[in-house]
Design a protein with these regions (language model features):
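A polyanion-binding, active-site-adjacent surface
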Residues: 12-199, 213-214
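Proline-rich intrinsically disordered, low-complexity coils
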Residues: 19, 71, 175-176, 202-203, ...
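Short, flexible loop segments at boundaries between secondary-structure elements
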Residues: 221-254
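Short conserved micro-motifs at the rims of enzyme active sites and ligand-binding pockets
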Residues: 174-176, 217-218, 238-241
Length: 259
């Protein structure tokens, strides 16, 4: 691989991924010889070489592959890790979820889905005073709830999540479906590597949104258990029973995750 900027980006990943990621980048070039060169000369998110940050999760630790659509379209928010908004720290406030969480619509709905899954909210009542009541309980010292988004990310990692996007970059002048199409060969290589791990069953593929669901066209995805849902941007995600059943046993809002 001749792109020095991509080699530098690999330094933020776990070394177990390096051969896979290099192979994946070669697949991108094979499909579109000039794509990476054009990208290198353009402005894109995430910045500071964080394009592969999700791959800090070691290859052999992956039990779930969660795929969203693309990075947040804001520099502070785009981290290279699916749905982990860099502009968010505190999860709670005195009146409910924090202002930062409420501004990040997908994250807000994911949090509410987790609260429903944990029995803290009912599907019919997920706004206003009931959320404020949960927030007050969550912030009590004896409650043992996570308090920050990095803690939520740590709990997801502890449960074996690889948090990817269908498109690894965001550019305002490139439609997200087109950007995602360019990265499909890369993701296919990643999934093949996960399917081929010796002595390990393929992880569960969790696809959120229409762009992520397009990965189902890849033959390799037939080897994976799958959980497919609408994008969390949609309010209906909060009531998605399949997602509640998937995430409920993980107790992701617990400060001491024992999974």
């Amino acid at each position: 691989m001749q792109h020095a900027w991509l080699e530098q980006a690999l330094e933020l990943t776990d070394v177990s991924w390096w051969p896979v990621l290099r192979h994946g980048l070669a697949a991108v070039v094979a499909a579109d010889a000039d794509y990476l060169e054009r990208l290198a000369q353009d402005d894109y998110l995430p910045t500071n070489g964080r394009i592969f940050t999700a791959f800090a999760q070691p290859l052999d630790a992956v039990r779930y592959v969660l795929v969203g659509e693309g990075p947040y379209p804001r520099e502070q928010s785009a981290t290279g890790v699916c749905f982990m908004d860099g502009a968010v720290d505190a999860l709670w406030s005195s009146s409910g979820l924090s202002k930062q969480v409420n501004r990040a619509t997908s994250l807000r709905n994911f949090m509410k889905m987790l609260m429903v899954a944990d029995g803290l909210l009912t599907p019919e009542s997920t706004t206003g005073e009931v959320v404020a009541d949960v927030a007050q309980r969550a912030q009590a010292p004896e409650a043992h709830f996570i308090q920050t988004l990095p803690e939520l990310q740590n709990n997801l990692h502890a449960n074996g999540f690889l948090l990817l996007n269908a498109a690894l970059v965001f550019r305002p002048h490139v439609p997200p479906p087109k950007e995602a199409k360019a990265w499909r060969p890369f993701l296919e290589v990643v999934l093949e590597a996960l399917a081929d791990r010796a002595g390990q069953a393929p992880p569960t593929l969790v696809l959120w949104g229409k762009i992520a669901a397009l990965l189902q066209a890849m033959p390799v995805t037939t080897q994976f258990p799958q959980a497919v849902a609408e994008h969390p941007y949609n309010l209906s995600f909060i009531k998605n029973k399949d997602m509640q059943q998937l995430f409920g046993p993980m107790r992701l809002l617990a400060a001491k995750n024992l999974q």
